[in-house]
Amino acid sequence: MCIALSHSLAALNSGIMSTHQGGSVRSIRPFKSSEEYLYAMKEDLAEWLKDMYHLEIIVDNFTEILENGSVLCQHANNVTEVAREFSVQYPQLAEKLQLPKSGVKLNMMAQPGTFLARDNVSNFIQWCRKEMDIKDVLMFETEDLVLRKNEKNFVLCLLELARRASRFGMSAPMLIQMEEQIEEEIREEMDLPPPEIPVPKPQRKLCDFKNLDQMVQHLVSRCTCPVQFSMIKVSEGKYKVGESSTLIFVRILRKHVMVRVGGGWDTLEHYLDKHDPCRCTSLSHKPAIKLGSLQKQVSAVHEVKTRLTPRLDNPSKVETTLIVSRSQSPLPPVEWRSYSSGRTRTTSSSNSLDNNENSPTFKMSPSDRRSMSTSYRAHERSATPSRKLFTEDNPEPQQLGNPQSVNFRHHHSTSSLASQLTGSEEENSCLSEVFSESQSRRQMGRTTVMSLKEPAMKEAFLSHTQSAHRKVMSATEQNNIQQGSRIVNQSINSQDSRPKTPSRFIRPPSPSKQIHFFHNQQNKGVEQNPKTQINSCTRSPSPVKQTSLTYKQEFTKRPATPSRISSQYKDGDKSAATEIIPSQDHIKSKPSVSSEERTIRTGRSTPTIHLNKNGITYREVSNLPPRMQPKPDALELSHSIERDCMYTPLPIDPEQEKQIYRSLEDEILTNIKVLEGDSEENHPENDSHGFNMLEKSTLPLNASTLKNPSGQGSVPRSGVYINTTWQSGACYDDVITELTKGHVKLNRVDVENWISKIPSKGMVKEAEEAHTSQRNQVRENGHTGAVSQRTIVRKKTPSTEIKGSKPKQLPSQRARQLALENKKKTVDNVSENQASTFSGDSGETVQEKIKLSQGLKPKRTLKKPERVPSIYKLKLRPKIRPRRDNRPEKKPSRIPTPVSYRQMPSRNNGKAVKRTQSYQANKTSAPQTLNESQSSTVILEDLDSDDKTLEHSAPSQAVETPVTIGNDQSKTEEEEESWV
């Protein structure tokens, strides 16, 4: 028979279901996943193990009791004993079945999580695979139980083990017994032969079916869709479901309604969620919560993708509305009844809203999420003509209900409100007044949440708001041109007579349809100032459906920013643009009226920028009365967002532009003075590198403020302030004169020069010129000694100037001086040695040898730095000694030294002698070579890097090289080998 799904039948069965309410609610609670049937299986297995082994095991500590593996191994050994007894009693049947033959080794003292516990679990797994032949798809791993990685496979493995053990007489859980009962029913229906040998089993008492139909009916009737999932009862515990009439077997397992699916089990609720087309497409699923009264039970909310709603223009035609957003909160219950009049529809909808306010489901879910999701659903409907709402009567208290219902109603669109509201204009105005009054009372609690939501919502809806606002303003302006004077007079009279009754309008749902309200307002006797409509701020969350927000006449006026005025009225029509300023004065003239009025607000105060003759002034138009002001944190967040959206850059007058250009020119001139350094570098007393740092430091301060258009005060502009009394340090003509001089040669600047100066290149040029003249004199006269002395003096000149001009010396300059001192000492030592060795020679010969020793500069190679040797060189370097044999029968023999090491000193001595002879033979060409090397040395000394400083000390080593070679000839062969 078909199960009735009406609410009357559910009310009749409420008394019967009262005893099973706890179990039904537990089985139909919302699923996080498909693990609800695991709870029922673990509950059954826990009770089964408790009866067999007298364990204190329940569902909550199911895995904790079994994770050490000792209980599992005991169960495996028990199954093996039962199999042995069965093979003795039924030997013929035992041959057809695969029975376990060996047990499992276990450690009873294993602690959970230890390796001993893992060994127990691993032994049980091997026994299941080898002895019981359980397939891998139903097996679990050690980590699944020890670390709780996969409890599902662990539970399925225990059920499969109990299923196989029940074949040879072992007691089985309730689920296995129900499986066997269902198999017998199928065998009887299909006329299959009974099993060959009935095995006696210790049976347990199964649950009866007296409450099964009521529980199944309760679970199926939770769906509120017009076309519900069909379940037809065939026999006790057997139903046909769906259009395909699939046969299912339903059983009650303690507190769960279980369905036999294939080779396993599932809960009926989860089965319906997977197979009911309506529930498969649902976005949320909430349980039915029973209220205090037993006769009155609110049906559960079931959210679906398609929802049939009546249209305003054609009530007989239905339209499918798609739900766009996932809602974590339920919808109001749908009452499927036909409405004859609009008043009945209004009452039923308000009652349904009031019923939902009392349900715990609404209390658990945030009101803001519900309102947001409801507004998205309302926006999906196509555009329909809007209605006007006026406030002329007092609000009806029975429609007010709860602030949550008003919040739910607040986010509907115009068409959804109009579909629920029919009748006279007075009735609509009453509901609109309720709309605004309840919103003002509820605003304080929602201020913080709404202010946090505004940053995300403002960026998404800003473009739609601006475009729709322009259309309303343009349409209102055209209407104002025709009826301007007459409406102004009527609005003044109406404001004096009824100051607290504002005129309202609702934005049409489609941007293409602009519906004006002046004609109907004249019929009602309530008029509105046309200038107010220009500045009324309306917002819409989508371009299709726009939120129906009502606004007060006086309090929500916000002047347009200068950018908007120029963009809207740039076509030459300036009449509407000039009307904005009087509306601002009109706001100031009536502060008492605007402070008393209340309207629908978004929980923020909007900063507006007024550009008048006295400059720019910021003014905040607050949409809240003083007692309803939001928190300062929420206001700061909304103010910063509004300021970013509403800010318009200031115009720059020609004087400010000229000041900026002058500051740029001075900056360019200062940079040019920094880069040019020839004239300033020649004066060592100037310690600031030829330019005044004071002028550069005061330049940003002078260019830090900007005058307003009238010249009064200073206004911040992007964090830069330009002073009104700015005076430049240089003239514009000086810059032109400096630039017309031509290309300025720039010098290379080192970082160290910002602290202490280096010798200028002018000195290097003078040294080169003097060196060239001296080289010419040497070619004519041939006096090499004088040339070398002049060269040495010339090399000393830059260093002495450096000492005079710099109080501090950097590491690179100290290294350069050390190299020059070493070179000087080396030259003096060489001259003394040459004078003592060749005492019989003339002074000219001694000077020639000094020149030759300086000219013997080797090839440029890497040089070790002159520093203290490392510990490796001092202590850890072994001294190489000749290898000796310690054979007693023979004399110790020396390993000969390689020939290459013996010939190296002699080769070096021969090369030195050859070089000396060649340079003595070529006396005419030697002075020229020496001078060239010295000139290159002078040029290299002007470089500032430390790598070049290392090269200056290379000639000193070159001078020392021949002397060292000459003195080392007396070294023995053994000492040479030791230093190799």
Curated annotation (Swiss-Prot):
Compartments in which it is found: Cytoplasm, Cytoskeleton; Cytoplasm, Cytoskeleton, Cilium basal body
Gene3D superfamilies, A to Z: Calponin-like domain (1.10.418.10), Gas2-like domain (3.30.920.20)
Molecular functions (GO terms): actin filament binding; cytoskeletal anchor activity; microtubule binding
Signal peptide limits: none
GO biological process: actin crosslink formation; microtubule bundle formation; protein localization to microtubule plus-end; regulation of cilium beat frequency involved in ciliary motility; regulation of microtubule polymerization or depolymerization
Keyword Secreted recorded: no
SUPFAM superfamilies: Calponin-homology domain, CH-domain, GAS2 domain-like
Domain GAR: 207-279
Positions with biased composition (Basic and acidic residues): 366-382, 763-782, 883-892
Chief place where the protein resides: cytoplasm
Keyword Cytoplasm annotated: yes
Residue ranges, compositional bias (Low complexity): 337-359
Annotated ranges, domain Calponin-homology (CH): 39-166
Any Pfam family hit: CH
CC per GO annotation: actin filament; cell projection; cytoplasm; microtubule plus-end; stress fiber
Bias (Polar residues): 396-407, 414-445, 475-496, 523-553, 828-845, 903-938, 954-969
Renumbered residue ranges of the record's region Disordered: 323-445, 474-503, 523-607, 763-980
Superkingdom classification of source: Eukaryota
Record note on disruption phenotype: Morpholino knockdown of both gas2l2.L and gas2l2.s resulted in mosaic embryos and impacted the number and distribution of basal bodies on the surface of ciliated cells. As a result, ciliary orientation was significantly reduced.
Keywords: Cell projection, Cytoplasm, Cytoskeleton
InterPro entries reported for this sequence: CH_dom (IPR001715), CH_dom_sf (IPR036872), GAR_dom (IPR003108), GAR_dom_sf (IPR036534)
Function: Together with gas2l2.S, regulates ciliary orientation and performance.
Family per similarity comment: Belongs to the GAS2 family.
PANTHER family referenced in this protein's UniProt entry, alphabetically: GAS2-LIKE PROTEIN 2B (PTHR46756:SF26), TRANSGELIN (PTHR46756)
Protein name: GAS2-like protein 2A
Organism: Xenopus laevis
Lineage: Eukaryota, Metazoa, Chordata, Craniata, Vertebrata
Gene, per the UniProt record: gas2l2.L
